[in-house]
A protein has these predicted regions:
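Physicochemical signature of membrane-embedded alpha-helices that form the seven-helix bundle of GPCRs
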Residues: 13-16, 63-69, 95-98, 121-124
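N-terminal signal-anchor transmembrane alpha helix
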Residues: 5-31
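Membrane-interface capping segments at transmembrane-helix boundaries
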Residues: 83-84, 134-146
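Juxtamembrane helix-break-helix junctions at the cytosolic face
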Residues: 2-3, 75-92
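Core segments of alpha-helical transmembrane spans in multipass integral membrane proteins
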Residues: 28, 35-81, 101
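Hydrophobic alpha-helical transmembrane segments of integral membrane proteins
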Residues: 87-125
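Alpha-helical transmembrane segments and their membrane-interface exit regions
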Residues: 124-136
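Hydrophobic residues within the alpha-helical transmembrane core of Major Facilitator Superfamily
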Residues: 19-22, 72, 104, 130
Length: 156
């Protein structure tokens, strides 16, 4: 398999991460009476921030939607980067590194603050990105070897 294959896998897993995160909306446990009381307090306590009046619930819910949007965009960009990697894997390495760092941090934060599903999703994505980075680097080594091969005169 080549770098672009693992980038495509990372894109699909990121899309699944987006779908799971979005399906979990509104991202709260509704079974615990104490949790319900906290959620109600979040919805009822309003304050002003940067000239806008809102609640903690507005921030919580809004950030959840923003995260879903960014996961969707990341999936789309990874798919596009995979297309670029098909013909020029070397040049997409800095992009792969950026996403790799982001998903490693995502996995660490999910481990600390959330639960297993986002940890596993981020970990699988990071693994695919790491493998694609190694494979992209190998394609550069192969190109270097090919560029040093000089054709000799005919018949030699």
């Amino acid at each position: 398999m080549k770098a672009f294959h693992f980038l495509r896998i990372a894109a699909v897993v990121t899309l699944l991460y987006f779908a799971g995160h979005t399906a979990g909306m509104p991202w709260t446990p509704y079974t615990d009476p104490e949790a319900l009381a906290i959620i109600e307090a979040m919805k009822n306590h309003s304050f002003e921030a940067e000239g806008l009046k809102g609640t903690y619930w507005d921030f919580y819910f809004g950030f959840g939607i923003i995260i879903s949007l960014f996961l969707f965009v990341q999936a789309a960009v990874l798919w596009q980067v995979a297309s670029l990697a098909r013909t020029d894997a070397i040049r997409v390495r800095p992009i792969i590194v950026s996403f790799l760092i982001a998903f490693i941090i995502n996995a660490a934060l999910a481990w600390k603050y959330f639960f297993a599903v986002p940890v596993v999703m981020s970990g699988v994505i990071a693994l695919c990105l790491a493998i694609s980075l190694v494979l992209a680097s190998r394609s550069q080594t192969a190109l270097r070897g090919a560029s040093t091969d000089k054709p000799g005169p005919a018949g030699s």
